[in-house]
Amino acid sequence: MVGWGVLILLMVLWLPRQAYAMHIMEGYLPLGWCLFWAALCLPALILGTRSLQKQVGDNLRMKLVLALSAAFAFVLSALKLPSVTGSSSHPTGVGLGAVLFGPMAMSVVGCIILLFQALLLAHGGITTLGANTFSMAVVGPTVSYVVFRIFQKSGFGRGVAVFLAAALGDLSTYLTTSLQLALAFPAPIGGVASSFWKFASIFAVTQVPLAVSEGLLTVIMVNWVMKYSPEVLSRAMNLPEEGHHEA
């Protein structure tokens, strides 16, 4: 685990200090919308806190896997790639935690990640924390969890279910962000729908391949956790320790 910590620290130090990626930056949304999205996040954060206490408790191995999931999401969501018109896109990394601990637990982890990124990396913002939390830490993990359960129960291998969960969770985050921006800034002609299409197309060029890449990375991480501590993965995913699906 020490090696992973050193790697993550080096990646964080390498990250650019000015980021205007898929996180909505400070001061960009009107105050009313900031309060609206923050209010929508509160139920998920309350339920998520209870979920984490119930799942993790004093179990050291569960704490390590939770920390790994948080570090994975922090590093991936802090990376940025140039998109069209001067914007940028990035992975979210929340699929791993959503699969292992559920969407409500990941809402708390994601909110903390976004807060640290806003304070340390100028990535996102404090006033827009609610909006960014709703898209990346509420909607994204929820979609990832639902997709994973559907494909898992449909008899697909663990690898396929995890890949689709992470990739579609990533895409749902960027679609939610596009909707948030469209609602706040409707186009003079075409209104919210036209504005949504504009914002979504800005992200789509880079976000689709990023979602595929994130899906593959998440599968690798799940397989690594399975080798490191299969009982933790089985418990987190509510699977029996024997007879689980293989990738």
Swiss-Prot record:
Gene3D superfamilies: 1.10.1760.20. Residues 1-21 form the signal peptide. Its main location: membrane. Keywords: Cell membrane, Cobalamin biosynthesis, Cobalt, Cobalt transport, Ion transport, Membrane, Signal, Transmembrane, Transmembrane helix, Transport. One of its GO terms (molecular function) is cobalt ion transmembrane transporter activity. GO terms for biological process: cobalamin biosynthetic process. One of its GO terms (cellular component) is ATP-binding cassette (ABC) transporter complex. It is a multi-pass membrane protein. Pathway: Cofactor biosynthesis; adenosylcobalamin biosynthesis. It is found in: Cell membrane. InterPro entries: CbiM, CbiM/NikMN. The chain crosses the membrane at residues 27-47, 64-84, 96-116, 119-139, 159-179, 181-201, 202-222. It comes from the Bacteria. Part of the energy-coupling factor (ECF) transporter complex CbiMNOQ involved in cobalt import. Forms an energy-coupling factor (ECF) transporter complex composed of an ATP-binding protein (A component, CbiO), a transmembrane protein (T component, CbiQ) and 2 possible substrate-capture proteins (S components, CbiM and CbiN) of unknown stoichimetry. NCBIfam families: cbiM, PRK08319.1. Belongs to the CbiM family. This is Cobalt transport protein CbiM. It comes from Kyrpidia tusciae (strain DSM 2912 / NBRC 15312 / T2). The gene is cbiM.
